[in-house]
Curated annotation (Swiss-Prot):
It is a peripheral membrane protein. It is found in: Plastid, Chloroplast thylakoid membrane. F-type ATPases have 2 components, CF(1) - the catalytic core - and CF(0) - the membrane proton channel. CF(1) has five subunits: alpha(3), beta(3), gamma(1), delta(1), epsilon(1). CF(0) has four main subunits: a(1), b(1), b'(1) and c(9-12). Keywords: ATP synthesis, ATP-binding, CF(1), Chloroplast, Hydrogen ion transport, Ion transport, Membrane, Nucleotide-binding, Plastid, Thylakoid, Translocase, Transport. Produces ATP from ADP in the presence of a proton gradient across the membrane. The catalytic sites are hosted primarily by the beta subunits. Its main location: plastid. This is ATP synthase subunit beta, chloroplastic. Its EC number is 7.1.2.2. It catalyses: ATP + H2O + 4 H(+)(in) = ADP + phosphate + 5 H(+)(out). It comes from Solanum bulbocastanum. One of its GO terms (cellular component) is chloroplast thylakoid membrane. CDD domains: ATP-synt_F1_beta_C, ATP-synt_F1_beta_N, F1-ATPase_beta_CD. ATP binds at G172, G173, A174, G175, V176, G177, K178, T179. The keyword Repeat does not apply.
Length: 498
């Protein structure tokens, strides 16, 4: 954390030293601090507790003011562990909210909630910082034009398109390809849109954060040789962190993304994994601050906290922040206040299916469960809308026929249904695609498929022009032309074997 956001280095100005306080109460991660009369810090100001613990080790704990209690006392939430703190320790009011480094120097690095690098690669080479608390862009700054954010991933662009500057919920269990999909999106936005990405790890497992970092280095999303050419900045506040850090790490990641949008005028992808943990941390802090719990024990300020984060994620006339948020649904209950509050903000949902992953169809995006508010003829055009609807109808009918096929076999179906099943199986395989970031695992070069090419490919399958081609020709290819070329190769190979 840059204690004084107006200077290039850490430190506390002489003015700030004139406003010292004292710790008077410690309740876990929540501290009560007394200040001299008339020198109370503002809400959201960063405080720093300084001193030594019982074995003489220096203590430097940053906190954020949450409440003014009266009697010259404030209540603050710690951003790191409060082990070793005692009453009477000196506290310094920094006079400003937590500020974090922003700009190109953050790419390829890992930060904590305070904007301090935690990757052992030395200090961040930037003097530019920004406070994590800001208001959402004004109405006059917003870009109200509805436009699609092309990802180059066929199943997403055709059936559940992302809105530029929108919010997408990513639903999927362990091992269905969530991380690989996230890395491919980071790669594609950098190549196709010249954009960058910010990844906020909110309250998830430290092991997963480490795995993601290693996989990003392996796939080239983070450039090991030249860190400055990396495509993503990582901000972690994992499960072992105090609730204050988990509650604010999403804002730290968002602040870094806002700089790329507002100053660099870029399109930015912001990943939040997991948005439920943001709510959960807020719930823990709320109870510690003495607020009366609301429905299901959640904080009474749930909607306000969610809104203050989500409303800053938007398109302006300068650039856009498109956010992809992993959503954990507690006990699979979609009516739980945490996911229910999140759904109100989402423009699209991408659901990953274990059944498709088991078939080896990657990305394992469920074409029938995934939805988007953008899939309307007035937004995407009649051709795109009609093609998407026909693809969904074909897949839905195939799903209905699967029980009959399992019991009686394909031969018992009518001629029309057999033809429909053959096309549905081709569509299902054509929805798969080789990824750039998975080249090291699959050996197949990655493919970016434009929207027009995607629509043309599915129209050809639906029209029946490609009924004579084998279904394996459509598996893990980019465009429809590659599928026809693959079919010719398969035919030549089978002829040679004869």
């Amino acid at each position: 954390m840059r204690i004084n956001p107006t200077t290039s280095g850490s430190g506390v100005s002489t003015l700030e030293k004139k406003n010292p306080g004292r710790v008077v109460q410690i309740i876990g991660p929540v501290l009560d601090v007394a200040f001299p009369p008339g020198k109370m810090p503002n809400i959201y100001n960063a405080l720093v507790v300084q001193g030594r613990d019982s074995v003489g080790q220096p203590i430097n704990v940053a906190c954020e003011v949450q409440q003014l209690l009266g009697n010259n006392r404030v209540r603050a939430v710690a951003m790191s562990a409060t082990d070793g703190l005692t009453r009477g320790m000196a506290v310094i009011d920094t006079g400003a909210p937590i500020s974090v480094p922003v700009g190109g120097a953050t790419l390829g690095r890992i930060f904590n909630v305070l904007g301090e690098p935690v990757d052992n690669l030395g200090p961040v080479d930037t003097s530019t910082t920004s406070p994590i608390h800001r208001s959402a862009p004004a109405f006059i700054q917003l870009d109200t034009k509805l436009s699609i954010f092309e990802t180059g991933i066929k199943v997403v662009d055709l059936l559940a398109p992302y809105r530029r500057g929108g919010k997408i919920g990513l639903f999927g269990g362990a091992g269905v390809g969530k991380t690989v999909l996230i890395m491919e999106l980071i790669n594609n936005i950098a190549k196709a849109h010249g954009g960058v990405s910010v990844f906020g790890g909110v309250g998830e497992r430290t092991r997963e954060g480490n795995d993601l970092y290693m996989e990003m280095k392996e796939s080239g999303v983070i450039n090991k040789e030249n860190i400055a050419e990396s495509k993503v900045a990582l901000v972690y506040g994992q499960m072992n962190e105090p609730p204050g850090a988990r509650m604010r790490v999403g804002l730290t990641a968002l602040t870094m993304a806002e700089y790329f949008r507002d100053v660099n005028e870029q399109d930015v992808l912001l990943f939040i994994d997991n948005i439920f943990r943001f709510v959960q941390a807020g719930s823990e802090v709320s109870a510690l601050l003495g607020r009366m719990p609301s429905a299901v024990g959640y904080q009474p300020t749930l909607s306000t906290e969610m809104g203050s984060l989500q409303e800053r994620i938007t398109s302006t006339k300068d650039g856009s922040i498109t956010s992809i948020q992993a959503v954990y649904v507690p006990a699979d209950d979609l009516t739980d206040p945490a996911p229910a509050t999140t759904f109100a903000h989402l423009d699209a949902t991408t659901v990953l299916s274990r059944g498709l992953a088991a078939k080896g169809i990657y990305p394992a995006v469920d074409p029938l469960d995934s939805t988007s508010t953008m899939l309307q003829p007035r937004i995407v055009g009649e051709e795109h809308y009609e093609t998407a609807q026909r693809v969904k109808q074909t897949l839905q009918r195939y799903k209905e026929l699967q029980d009959i096929i399992a019991i009686l076999g394909l031969d018992e179906l009518s001629e029309e249904d057999r033809l429909l099943v053959a096309r549905a199986r081709k569509i299902e395989r054509f929805l798969s695609q080789p990824f750039f970031v998975a080249e090291v695992f699959t050996g197949s070069p990655g493919k970016y498929v434009g929207l027009a090419e995607t629509i043309r490919g599915f129209q050809l399958i639906l029209s029946g022009e490609l009924d004579g081609l084998p279904e394996q020709a459509f598996y893990l290819v980019g465009t429809i032309d590659e599928a026809t070329a693959k079919a010719m190769n398969l035919e030549m190979e089978s002829n040679l074997k004869k």
